[in-house]
């Protein structure tokens, strides 16, 4: 079994004590420590974030497991056995994100965190609408682990949409998954992760560096959500669950049932049921 990752700017160190039963490859690191083997990145992509996504999306192996570099230190023998069992049963597996975002919520998060600007999100939404994307069927993925075999068509389509939709790859993944009609297996992320690590809200899986970059000013996504609701036909009451922590002002989007009670006094409800 091949396990691979992509690492640009050396934002984490490659762990050297990896479980047996797999070959380990890294894109973007020359002369990595054992057991890692180095593979080259393309030369035509200058942005380090986009570069790190290139081989994540355009998987060069017939059969492999992609793992985000920031989570490699959490892999163990149980993970190897789990991946082997999945590959015996299916050609493609991806986790469902615990927040279970709708399309509106996913876009709102990208803008609010300064990851993708409003113009890009609106143009992307209009283009996938013309391509026949069903917004009410949006699947909320967590792409830190991808277990796949011969998914060349999906990979190509994913990259095509990725370069149009901003620096994050979940939105374009969901679009490619639906439009390619790829058959896949999935599981709730926490349920899957708890089989080899701690995926609960305060678990070790979430204690890492991720998404600490900005490509636009960001801010309150309410105006953007109004525009996207009109384009997509998605009802805001049902498809935009938003709240804010009273103490910090942090925006909470999507399914928050694992973190807060229904009428939790620490929250200011912005929208949704």
Predicted segment positions?
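N-terminal anchoring/stem segment of glycosyltransferases
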Residues: 1-52, 62-63, 164-167
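A conserved donor-nucleotide-binding helix/loop in the catalytic core
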Residues: 43-67, 77-82, 172-173
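The conserved acidic donor/metal-binding loop of glycosyltransferases
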Residues: 68-72
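Conserved donor-nucleotide/metal-binding helix-loop-beta segment in metal-dependent transferases, i.e.
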Residues: 75-105
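Catalytic core and acceptor-binding pocket of nucleotide-sugar-dependent glycosyltransferases
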Residues: 115-213
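A short beta-strand micro-motif
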Residues: 241-245
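Basic/aromatic-rich interaction segments and small domains that mediate binding to polyanionic partners
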Residues: 250-265
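Intrinsically disordered, low-complexity, charged/polar segments
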Residues: 265-272
